[in-house]
């Protein structure tokens, strides 16, 4: 299955049309089975929005995966409406749920480890956090989680070891969970 996790830009216009779509077509990918969106900031959704608007001609998105609806801001609500209008299935993923493809050594899973229900903050703090696993490879994808969401993640006990950390805020100078990263 083909998965896209976030896709946008706050400083490159038409990132979907001029960067994401050409790259996917170059790789021979014409359909995205699951497009995950961690939260509603433009730098995470603008390219996915473009793909949804143009999928009859370009890249098709079969399922748009969003965090729990209680964390949707206006941009995520608009994205869900756009997806539905263009025939894309909408799915929510909650902490503890996962998408799995394949079996045995070929098994790939994307497990949602945050946010837990009832987080008092929204926006970046409520970013969807995913643990990707394929064989012995693991990667933590943090969206832009911060503050209460980051603290909740540590307390949840869901954080596992990972080989690669996709740092929150695109590698900001204020890294997620520095003590946790050192212990992994």
Residue spans for each PLM region:
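Non-globular, low-confidence helical/coil segments that flank catalytic cores
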Residues: 1-184
């Amino acid at each position: 299955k083909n998965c896209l996790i976030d896709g946008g830009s706050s400083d490159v216009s038409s990132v979907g049309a001029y960067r994401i779509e050409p790259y996917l077509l170059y790789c021979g990918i014409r359909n995205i089975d699951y497009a995950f969106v961690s939260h509603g900031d433009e730098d995470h959704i603008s390219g996915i929005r473009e793909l949804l608007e143009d999928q009859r001609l370009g890249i098709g998105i079969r399922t748009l995966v969003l965090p729990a609806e209680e964390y949707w801001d206006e941009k995520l609500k608009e994205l869900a409406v756009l997806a539905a209008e263009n025939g894309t299935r909408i799915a929510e993923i909650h902490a503890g749920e996962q998408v799995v493809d394949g079996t045995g050594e070929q098994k790939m899973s994307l497990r949602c480890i945050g946010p837990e229900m009832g987080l008092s903050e929204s926006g970046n703090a409520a970013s969807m956090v995913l643990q990707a696993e394929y064989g012995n490879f693991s990667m933590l994808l943090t969206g832009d989680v911060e503050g209460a969401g980051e603290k909740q993640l540590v307390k949840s006990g869901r954080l596992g070891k990972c080989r690669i950390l996709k740092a929150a805020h695109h590698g900001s100078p204020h890294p997620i969970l520095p003590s946790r990263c050192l212990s992994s």
